[in-house]
UniProtKB/Swiss-Prot annotation:
GO cellular component, one term: plasma membrane
Keywords assigned by UniProt, alphabetized: Cell membrane, Membrane, Transmembrane, Transmembrane helix
PANTHER family named among the record's database cross-references: UPF0703 PROTEIN YCGQ
Record protein name field: UPF0703 protein YcgQ
Organism per entry: Bacillus subtilis (strain 168)
Amino acid sequence: MFRLLVLMGFTFFFYHLHASGNLTKYINMKYAYLSFIAIFLLAILTAVQAYLFIKSPEKSGHHHDHDCGCGHDHEHDHEQNKPFYQRYLIYVVFLFPLVSGIFFPIATLDSSIVKTKGFSFKAMESGDHYSQTQYLRPDASLYYAQDSYDKQMKQLFNKYSSKKEISLTDDDFLKGMETIYNYPGEFLGRTIEFHGFAYKGNAINKNQLFVLRFGIIHCIADSGVYGMLVEFPKDMDIKDDEWIHIKGTLASEYYQPFKSTLPVVKVTDWNTIKKPDDPYVYRGF
């Protein structure tokens, strides 16, 4: 009975993620077909387990009271004689993620995660892309052969370098950021606009902060926080996690806290916006 309930629960959970649109908070929707396969397989297993439960001797009323001396039902009896906690401990392992996934609210990543992990630009300084979470600069080279990656970046450079004004949307946020960080000198003086959540971090000046988005490559486990340093004409009182849309001119400057030269947006126009229903951005391949 417990097996049947657990399988029914997981089938419902995956279906609920699709129906509610919350699947995007866990994986890149490019891989949504995997969850459809999971739903299909779980539904089959649930049906099989339901059939076995209905046809079990306890449900059908056919009991074997005689002892043939051949060890019949010894394994079943041995299982029943185990202590309760031994028989059902394994189900707790499955029930915990199931209950938490269905009944607990889904927490989206925000600036508190950035603070906890430590916000730095070490990935760019060291060139070690494997050891830590990516910050500011997206790097998809990990997922391509070098020739293929270089070819894609050249195509993206041709796309964005032909624009006098670059408007980054949810669909191309990561690709646009990656292109600008890879060719910073080629975009100086260009107008750029995008939106994200504010994060002050180690900003030295009160008129500077970071505008960031959490980006997902495959799933939430490989997420990074990407965006740019922005500089306002005057001191601003913008709180962390406040969502803003900014527009300005691309420049570059040496940022002392990171000991690196960063692209920076000199803001000419900005406004606060409502937090999007889906706060994440995704990398297309």
